[in-house]
Amino acid sequence: MKKTYSGICSYLLLGALSLALSVSAQSGGQPLQVNVESADGSYTIGTPGSSHATLHAGIAVQLDGRWVQSSQYPRHVVKTAPVSDDLESAKEWVVAFSGLNGEPDLTYHLRAYPDKPFADIQVVVHNSTAKPVSVESIRAVAAVGNSILDLNAPAAQDRVLSDSFSEDRPNITIHDLSDAKDGMHRGVGSQLIYNRQSHESVFFGALTSDRFVTVLRVHVSPKGTDPRISAFEVDSTGTTELETDEWGSLHRADADDRLPLELTVAPGAKLSSERLLVSMSRNYHQQLETYGTIIRQLHHARVAAATPLGWWSWTAYYFGLNEGAALTNAEWEAQHLKSLGYNFFHIDEGYQYARGEYSTPDARVFPHGLAGMERQVTNLGLVPGIWTAPFEVSERSWVYQNHPDWLVHNAKGKPIHIGWVTDHNDRLFVLDCTNPGAQQYLRKTYSTLVHGWGIRYIKMDFMDDSAVEGHYYRPNTTAMEAQQTGLRIIRQTVGDNVLLDKDGSVMLNPVGYVDFGRISQDTGHTFGASKDAATGIAARYYMNRNFFVSDPDAFSVSTQTVDDQAWHGGQRPLTPDEARVSIALSAVSGGMYEIGDDLPTLGAEPERLALVKNKDLMNMARLGRPSTPVDLMTYLPQDGQPSIFLLRESPRQTILTVFNWTDRTRTHSVQLSSLGLPAKGTYSISDVFDQKPVSSQDTSALAVNQPAHSVRVFKIIDTAVPAEAPAVHAQHASSGKAGETLTFSAYPADSKAPILCYQWDFGDGVSLEGTHVTHAYTRAGTYQVKVVAMGLDGRNGEDSFSLPVSGSISTRFSPALNQRYQSNP
């Protein structure tokens, strides 16, 4: 499933990465200035023309709790050579450190690419000694010198965007450099540092996730009244540092369960770090988007799924959903929303008997089981979905009670305890995905869900909490390796046509296995829930259709409150403005679009239901592209977090979304030219919510006045650009035989007008929707096939063709030709 790394320049011919924004940014196409110091083998990376390197660093390895630095080695050898990947050449430095008595040798491979503002580095530990060594971490960046990550302006103007261990461990917050908890900004997977004065930025991002997590740390020390970066390092390491933090699953665990990662490297063997991208630019949006696209190509990301629109149970019922309420909501969705495109029906946690026993329903709430009910959901024309936490096992589950040997253990042979389901109820443990018995359990569970219950979409949660270091059945296994093993088994079991959604999990490790991925924390029936989730949705915008299709969590727009869920259940109903905030936040993600309200409650409120039926918002989701957070790193202090999002839907049409996250009235003046629109253009601007025109005395700017807790969504049409229907091209077989399953695919014929979806008419009374569809004709004939590309504002394009079908379906009994069907293992 994963692709071995072999260079990254070939993955940059991407078409249009995104809208080119004028946000004090310049093109970031210049190659970096890379050098290896002959005196000590350290490396420097900077931008052309700069008087100093932005980064000067060595490498290191942690062995048995102590750090060994490259500067300690008495010998180093530097070799350079041109290397080639699929498209471009690169210059590679190979720097080998040796001669330190009793210690393994260290080597780093550093590549720089022509015309690309990035480099990449990987460290290799070679055990040249006569005895095994135990490796805990490999450090690819150990910054040295007095000027660390200097962006040519006062460090007090730096802002730091640190990705986190998972979508909400912890919640993402963009910090000023001085706002460093315990003197450190820690990121997992990636970290962006941007200076608001120089507009320069440096970005570090993990390119691989083969064995380790990548942890980045910016250490901050005061310098008079101004902060400065005193140290910076990037490690390939285990998860224990993260799981033992205040939000981690081992925060309250016994010392025996807090195992540091220790990988044994035999004499003569090698161990590699993860590969790390280093990028420097004056366009941080481009840095993030380029990184996302590289990840998509390297890991064969599954990003082709159509955007799901539907309903989920969690914020409507939490643990309280039962059979009757589920069927009522399914019937309501089918009768009132399916015709608009809402057809996913997702049952979240609460249906199962125990975590770790997902194919056994709780008879108290689902007395007739789930198989029959999910068939009813399917018969309503809905897509059934289910929640699981694949690698968590509770003490009530069959696995824990019958096979504790299938669990991850500590050094004393006891299962590692990772907390409780809620409030010290139901202790949790970790499934060992390297154990053959546990692997068979996974196959049986997910085969039952898919083949027995008919599930077509599966959410996989709490993979962050279960990613612990420990003693696995397969020795020398890391938490990341074990997780990938489990994901591989699940994907092989369910097949390619079942949709998998990464919920609680690290970001990079599941890429290539999952179709969807949660990008921020849980939402709910409060404005605070939307506000807290918004920064994560903004910060990870570039992951949408690069890592996976984004899952922003469900929106809530009704007046429903859930009194016994104090966190996000809401003590008072959402105001109309707050309801608009919730649904607009989902729309700007460009990802999954799920209703989180009890549907009959929503249906009793026509004004709230109208939000769910708003075509412009639905089109933002169906288009599948994220709105760019224009002020991601430049938001005003008065706003407190990114507030302005831009989606260029077509050369003619743009959507501008402006949030007010504060508790007071806010006013923004948005220059249309700053959005990449012609300064002297003629525009028709309307409000997406009420469809009324927006007038402005200044045609070059848009004044946005907002009350507290509100959002404005504007549709901006450049009237100088003519409206066009999308152009579509159908790919198909030239002919077929009766009974033969034929494949049909539709593609945009150009990039001018966007396409929301494709609708097929096969000429025999059957129609389907989708980019790739199959159909079989039952009799010979020449059929007129048509595919319609649905565009914005009802403008549609089409392609048609004649398809000759010959022969007939044999009705003879031919037992010699029969073949026994075998399902996936």
Predicted segments with their positions:
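Extracellular/lumenal mature domains of secreted and surface-exposed proteins
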Residues: D718-P825
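Glycan-recognition surfaces
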Residues: Q401-Q440, T485-L602
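C-terminal beta-strand-rich structural cap/linker in extracellular carbohydrate-active enzymes
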Residues: S696-A725
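Carbohydrate-binding surface patches
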Residues: S586-S589, E594, Y635-L677, H709, ...
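Short Pro-Gly-centered flexible turn/kink motifs
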Residues: E262-R282, Q706-I717
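Exposed beta-strand face motif in extracellular beta-rich ectodomains
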Residues: A119, R712, G781-V785
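Polysaccharide-binding surfaces and accessory modules of carbohydrate-active proteins
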Residues: Q26-S236
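Aromatic-lined carbohydrate-binding/catalytic grooves of carbohydrate-active enzymes
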Residues: T307-S447, H451-Y473
